[in-house]
Amino acid sequence: RLIEYNFSGHRSEAEGVLFGCYIWDGSTWQKDEDATFGLRCSATLGSGKGTIKFERDGDAANANYKIGMDSPQLGGYAQVMDSPERNSLPMEGLTATVAAWEEPVNDLAVDTEIPLLVRVFRTDGTIIPVSIDAFLEPENSKAVQKSVYAEAYTVIFCYEM
C-alpha cells in the first residue's frame, strides 16, 4: 500500500519539484495536465534530504494514490491523484500491476524526468508483470501494450519553478 522514495540533494541547486502524471493512450504516454503539480523550495535543496510517498487510498485495485512529500526545504505536502477513467473501470476481473523505482534518488539529476511508478490495469483477471522501464520504452512492455488502462507518475527536480 505504501511506496517510499528517499532522495538527497548532494549540493543540488534545485529550487522546486514537479510531479507529473501520464496516461497511456494506446500508442504513447500523454501528460495529464490536470494531475501535474509542483512545489517550490523555501531555499535551494542543497544537501537536503526528503521522502516522496505514494500511498494507495483504499484496497480496490483501482484505488487512487495519494502522493506525499516531506523535506525540510519543501515542508510536507500531499495530493490525491484522481482519475475518472480509472475509477470507471469494471471491478469484476480487474487486476493492477505496479512497478516502482527501486533505489534512493541520490545525486539528483536536476531538470531530468524520473519515472517513479507505473501502474497497468487489465479486466480479464490476468496479470502481466510490468517494469519501471515501461515508461521510457513502452513499445517493449507487453503489460502496457495489453492494458485497458495504464498510468505513470514522474518527478523532476527543477532549477526554477
Give short role names for the model-derived ranges.
Residues 77-124:
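Intrinsically disordered, low-complexity segments enriched in Gly and acidic/Ser/Thr residues
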Residues 4-8:
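Short edge beta-strand/loop segments characteristic of extracellular beta-sandwich folds
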